[in-house]
Amino acid sequence: MKKTFLSIALLLAAGIPSVMAQVSRINPIPQQCSQQGELFDLPAQWRVVCSKALESSIARQALNLISVKEDAKAPFTVTLALANEKAGRKAGKPLAKKAEAYSLQVSEKGITIVGNDERGLYYGVRSLIDMSGAGRLQVTNITDWPDVAWRGVVEGFYGTPWSHSARLSQLDFYGKHKMNVYIYGPKDDPYHRDHWRDPYPEAEGRLISELAEHARQQGVNFYWAIHPGVDIKWTTQDRDALVHKLELMYDLGVRAFAVFFDDIWGEGTKADKQAELLNYVDDNFISKKPDVVPLVFCPTEYNRAWANDQKGYLRTLGSTLHKSIEVMWTGNSVVHCIDKESMDWINERIQRRGYIWWNFPVSDFVRDHILLGPAYGNGLDIAPDVSGFVSNPMEHAEASKIALYGIADYTWNMQRYDADADWERALTEILPDAREALRTFALYNKDLGQNGHGFRREEGTELADVMAAVERGDKAAPDMVEARCRALRTAADILLTNRSNPQLIRELRPWLLQAKNLADYGEAVCQMARCKDGKTFPTFDDLYRQSRSIREQMYDLENSDVRHALQPGIKVGTKVMLPMINKLFAKTVEAWNAGHGTDYASSSDYVPYKLSGNVPQLILLPVSIQGQRVSIAPSNEVIKWPAGASITIESERTVTLQGMDFNLGIAGVAKHFRLEVAEGNGEWREVSLLHYNDKDPVIHTGNELGGMKATRLRLTNKTGEEQQVYFRNFNFVVQ
């Protein structure tokens, strides 16, 4: 099936007719489809028939999106019905006994859409809308249903939350692609987390109401999530405060709720107390509201790497938590793909099917990358093992739609899911007038680069023959590399002035500028490789200096961008494209040195600081520079710092330290750590650490640090036991 659907996608992208073109426009791919192949034009008018109860349904309203006039006397009839209505029973083949199932029958005389429920009927209309693109229909009989009951998105990333307009656009996208869940849980919303007891101010409350209503119109459950774990007290007062807050949200129009206890420690992490609270909420709020869907819960041990089987946190939840409550799970680690074995492991412990929170394409831990690749890696056989599957996206809402397009298809029809084909189709939908430019650019923005979770993605597979030519030293290698660079620069130029999706281009702009730098660097290196003359401008020396200059400009752009103060940086093509150009640079310089007796440095890399150590959650974090400030990227999770373990930052040159501070998220924790500096291979010298007051989580250094010369800094847990901390920031300033 993979090749079949990929070819269809490419035909559509190229505008080439196909006998399957109309049905193949439907996304997600239907479960069952009987195609006769006859294509015909949309009628100029049609008559719509439905029960009075369905006149105000979202399915009936969505039908208006098709540009056909309604005429009570038109010979072409569109019938909308529920399966339990008379018209639905007369439609013929019974539907699968699954929520949101629908059938769509299209003939030259009329259309009949039957849904098991109103949302299923709405999905049938959405499929008709997809099929009717370009003003054509196709005789067909579709029976369709979702593999996963709850499908969609959780806005659960750290960093800049989505704007209100971005959320509205997302909800439109979810409805269009048959996703029925949007969980509102932005970490920076104070009324979701830090001030969870407090009501929203009137203006913010109106925005929540608008989102909830807009979601309803798109067939999406708008979940409002509350995160009380940071400071909850297991008291009647706090229990009632939580229920009261949910009541206030209900009054704003919210009909779906989630409770998060992730990324915390201390009193709030107790499984029995969490279960007791959730059961109380379920009994005294959820079950008393007939129009509210089941409660969703994100536990503290939300992945296998953090689960402590000996303490039995997950088993306690499984045995005591009401079975109607959904339990979220990220997999074998915080960022991990899901397979059947991992689902068997968690489902046995929580005594229900896990509700997957998939941390892709979220980039809050690799903010220097933008992730435009396909959604792949999850098992195609796990549909019976999951109750829900939601994606945590990037803060770049429009760019996230590329991956979300595939996730919608995957959760609807797993067995026929083809990540590559879906990716091709997504590019066409997101930017149809510049699809090839977007595709070319996206090829170099798939992988996450080095990161604390060790989660990587395929990138640069299309460069395999080019890389092989470079490694062999083929004479054709420079031309092959240059062609790729020219295509990348052309794509970036086209996209930078595209006006059809301005929000997407705003999100991509920093990476588009860096892509141009990368392409310029590659072309300069290719000119070097072809240079035979050391006298005529540009000489080899000129091209060498130009190449090194562009690499430094790339580094400057990476570290001057201030979109994210905690982790600046703009990286493109770091997995294959940039290393390939660097290799060509090195081979070219080495060959020139050998032939001309010169001594040019053959490395163009510019990495002045490196991080190492034996704290697994930290050692893969990138190091960045802004002016004189050097920073380690923050981590969003609880750091389990082993006894005696340390991290070390090493500089390529001796630096003079001016100041330093870091935030491990806990007041008074400085006494558990030792900071040392060393110059070259010299002795380690300890630097005193202190907090400015008892409530200050920021750790400051003593005055002796100022003026110290160093090439290495080391921070060690000096206690004899594991320390659980955050890693909010780590900065030092050099002269």
Predicted segments with their positions:
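Bacterial Sec-dependent N-terminal signal peptides
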Residues: M1-R25
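Catalytic-core regions of glycoside hydrolase
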Residues: F157, K245, D251-R255, I264-E424
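Feature activates predominantly on carbohydrate-active enzymes
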Residues: L95-K245, D251-R255, S287
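Conserved, mostly hydrophobic/aromatic
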Residues: V48, D117, V153, Y174, ...
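Beta-sandwich interaction modules
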Residues: L689-V725
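Disordered, acidic Ser/Thr/Pro-rich linker "stalks" and the adjacent N-terminal cap
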Residues: M580-K587, W592-L657, N663-F673, V677, ...
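Acidic, contiguous N-terminal accessory segments
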Residues: A21-E108, N116, A134-I142
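C-terminal functional modules
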Residues: A419-D605
